[in-house]
Amino acid sequence: VQLTNRINRIQTSPTALVISAAEQLKAKGVDIADFGPGEPDFPTPDHIKKAAIKAIEENRTKYTPTGGIAPLREAIPAWHSRELSSNYSPKECAVTVGGKHAIFNAICVLVQAGDEVILPAPYWVSFPDIIKYAGANPVIVQTRPDSGFSAKAADIEKAITAKTKVVIINSPSNPTGGAVDGAEFERILALCRKHNIWLMADECYSHFVYDPHKPFSIASAKDSKDHVIVIGSVSKTFAMTGWRIGYALAPEPLIQAIVKIQSQSTSNPTSIAQYAALEAMRGTMDTVPPMLAEYTKRRKRIVEGLRAISGVSCEWPAGAFYAFPNISAYLGEGKNSLAKTCTELSKLLLEKAHVALVPGEAFGAPGFLRLSYATSLERIDVGLRRLENFFAHAEAAV
């Protein structure tokens, strides 16, 4: 089958491939310590589920406006204002089929062939391919473990050219958990103002940050609106990944363009899911602190466990629910090497140790592995024991 150059520029999500391989082994009865999925293991809160049931019972199952039902387009800016001190109106909000869809739509209306998008690495797996699909080129700016994988304005400035149209900042970050502090974020915003560039702030993990960090949005900065696009989602904060509701907050002309492209692709997000999201936005936030408390325990367990493995180093994530250890000591051609690449090593770990994780190459970070600790302490302990045993008996394992 002859496919377009556009589709040939992108690849299937590497995380989806890892999940698929792990599921195949699970189907054969193999017990897998699964650190692959990037989603909360908590259920959607009951009050949100009940709102969806009520919507079904009230027959709210028809088409809705493409950009979302009016109450939700009012509730999202109001929630964002309460939680993150921004100031958006309903006309500056578009509801999308998940946060990824908001990113896709925004990139597609902002860039064209030959444009550049600055992307700090390690990056979320879908960013480069969305940029390429839109015809633009990702310009990668490396972050460093010793700075907590936090993007720096000075590094971004060096990458800006006349072709730069967007800078993407995902904070807290998937895959590293790195977070950009408010002062640094404002320096990045100042750069974007200076060069007339859009700053896309992916805030999908905004409420999962660890002391001393606090939830932050660059949209709270003075006069930020003209250069900022906020991307958000109910997926992580409210454990609603499968409901597929995200949003964009931006100046009205950009929102109108996002709604236009959505009108010719998905049309409206699922009506029932929108009413569930409406309850999430209007209802209690009491379910978030217990989730964060549990992630805090898991973070401590997994980072300390990884650091106890000889040859492995791991920074403390500032947010999200991922550990991102450096395992480069076990890669290459040397006598202690287990594989040439992280991708090869992750396959070995799945096949030999029955541990599923995502290789760093997927995130533009060879030499690293991503482990999601959105799983129980008991399963974290099982996985850590298997990893420790694998690396301790490396020659036998290979």
What are these regions (language model features)?
Residues 278, 293-303, 314-333, 367:
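Conserved glycine-rich beta-strand-loop-beta hairpin in the small C-terminal domain of fold type I
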Residues 221-296, 300-309, 390:
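Conserved core segment of the aminotransferase class I/II
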Residues 139, 143-216:
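Active-site phosphate-binding strand-loop segment of PLP-dependent enzymes
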Residues 18, 35, 52, 76, ...:
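Generic structural signal for small/hydrophobic residues in well-ordered secondary structure
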Residues 2-98, 105, 134, 280-283, ...:
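N-terminal small-domain helix-loop-helix segment of the aminotransferase-like
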Residues 78, 82, 157-158, 335-340, ...:
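PLP-dependent enzyme catalytic core of the Aspartate aminotransferase-like
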Residues 133-139:
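A short helix-loop-beta submotif of the ANL/AMP-binding
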Residues 109-131:
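Conserved PLP-anchoring active-site segment centered on the Schiff-base-forming lysine
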